[in-house]
């Protein structure tokens, strides 16, 4: 067997130097067995070393948790993906959201909701008014434009359908049912000593700042040990209770394709094996920033056996990447306290997965 430590070391050490990353943690899983590789520090001042229990902001990887919560509502018969968005929020009734489905919101196809809320609307008080005044650029279901306000609203409405606030449902129901004990939206006082300091492009300390639907779109903080457990239950959900098995199946369903990528709920999927360039391309800035015509899969299709499932996530001071291949039982998680380019995360993960799949 390949010496995984050697592969991870030789991949991560030059990467951290080139990208000036203070701290980074890698978790891999193979045949149900997790291994951890930790590098550098969680905080440049205190020099606290990174461990597999260090908490990182995972940015948009949070979208996969939001999708799982929505899948849980779906499994419990509280919503249908075909329902109009306005059904769950009276303030949006009688207008465009009567013609935009929950699935459109969950897959970034509502009609051009932007990547971020505009600054003046980026708070809970202004949020509803933002959606009421938003003018679609495209017909619903025609174009994919990756968007926090889109999947954020999806999560918010899913929580409405379950009759509880999103944060409460996530922290008290969904995360415990997934077996995640060190995954938080709000990091409790008792865990703050584990919360890494993030560093921006200039190396200045930074933490995620509050915004509209932040919990739903980019609010999770977790460790590589919890995240690799999450990967394992995504690959082998049979140990979970039935509604969560169904929830995970919904997130791994392909709803449409854009070029080589199949869009799930939260997760993005590719045929495996995949060349590194194709995976880099699917996680490119262009893919995140520009609209792309979608080809709907009717009916939606369960992921084929050999599929790589992945998601990137970033905040001002953190960079995350998760990738796994359920048919092989292989997964990798890479968390860092710096927002460095997605291409570098993907290349590192691809090298590690390829070495494990020898």
Curated annotation (Swiss-Prot):
Q: Does the keyword Repressor apply?
A: no
User: Listed GO molecular functions?
Assistant: beta-lactamase activity
Any one Pfam family here would be Beta-lactamase
| Alphabetized UniProt keyword annotations | Antibiotic resistance, Hydrolase, Periplasm
**One GO term of the biological process aspect:** response to antibiotic
Tree of life domain:
Bacteria
Q: What is its EC number?
A: 3.5.2.6
Q: Which reaction does it catalyse?
A: a beta-lactam + H2O = a substituted beta-amino acid
Main location as per UniProt: periplasm
Q: Is the Cytoplasm keyword given for this protein?
A: no
Report the locations given in the UniProt record. Answer: Periplasm
Task: State the InterPro entries in the record.
Answer: Bact_CellWall_Synth/Modif (IPR050491), Beta-lactam-related (IPR001466), Beta-lactam/transpept-like (IPR012338), Beta-lactam_class-C_AS (IPR001586)
Cellular component per GO, a single term: outer membrane-bounded periplasmic space
Q: Where is the active site?
A: 60, 146
PROSITE patterns with a match to the protein in the record: BETA_LACTAMASE_C
Functional description taken from the UniProt entry: This protein is a serine beta-lactamase with a substrate specificity for cephalosporins.
Indicate the family of this protein.
Answer: Belongs to the class-C beta-lactamase family.
Other comments on record: The class C beta-lactamase family has a specific amino-acid numbering system known as SANC, for structural alignment-based numbering of class C beta-lactamases, or else the simpler name structural position. A multiple sequence alignment was used to derive a consensus sequence and then the consensus was numbered taking into account insertions and deletions. This allows use of identical numbers, e.g. for active site residues, despite differences in protein length.
Question: This protein is called what?
Answer: Beta-lactamase
Q: Origin organism of this chain?
A: Pseudomonas fluorescens
């Amino acid at each position: 067997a390949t010496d995984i430590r050697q592969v991870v070391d030789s991949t991560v050490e030059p990467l951290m130097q080139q990208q000036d990353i203070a701290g980074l943690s890698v978790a891999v899983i193979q045949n149900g067995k997790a291994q951890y590789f930790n590098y550098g520090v969680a905080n440049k001042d205190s020099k606290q070393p990174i461990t597999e229990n260090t908490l990182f902001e995972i940015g948009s990887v949070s979208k996969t948790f939001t999708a799982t919560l929505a899948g849980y509502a779906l499994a419990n018969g509280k919503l249908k993906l075909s329902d109009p968005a306005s059904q769950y929020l009276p303030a949006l009734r009688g207008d465009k959201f009567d013609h935009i489905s929950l699935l459109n919101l969950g897959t970034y196809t509502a009609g051009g909701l932007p990547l971020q809320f505009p600054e003046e609307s980026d708070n809970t008080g202004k949020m509803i008014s933002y959606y009421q005044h938003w003018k679609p650029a495209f017909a619903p279901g025609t174009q994919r434009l990756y968007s926090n306000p889109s999947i954020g609203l999806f999560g918010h409405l899913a929580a409405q359908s379950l009759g509880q606030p999103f944060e409460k449902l996530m922290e008290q129901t969904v995360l415990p049912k997934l077996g995640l004990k060190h995954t938080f939206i709000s990091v409790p006082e008792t865990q703050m000593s584990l919360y890494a300091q993030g560093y921006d492009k200039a190396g200045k300390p930074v933490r995620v700042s509050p915004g509209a639907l932040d919990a739903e779109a980019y609010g999770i903080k977790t460790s590589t040990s919890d995240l690799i457990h999450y990967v394992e239950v995504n690959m082998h959900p049979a140990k979970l209770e039935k509604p969560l098995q169904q929830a995970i199946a919904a997130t791994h369903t392909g709803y449409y394709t854009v070029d080589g990528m199949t869009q799930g709920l939260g997760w993005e999927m590719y045929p495996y094996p995949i060349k590194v360039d194709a995976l880099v391309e699917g996680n490119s800035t262009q893919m995140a920033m520009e609209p792309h015509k979608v080809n709907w899969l009717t009916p939606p299709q369960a992921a084929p056996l050999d599929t790589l499932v992945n998601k990137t996530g970033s905040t001002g001071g953190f960079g995350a990447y998760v990738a796994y291949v359920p048919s092989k039982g292989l997964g990798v998680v890479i968390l860092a306290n710096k927002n460095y380019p997605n291409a570098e995360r993907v290349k590192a993960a691809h090298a590690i997965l390829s070495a494990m799949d020898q």
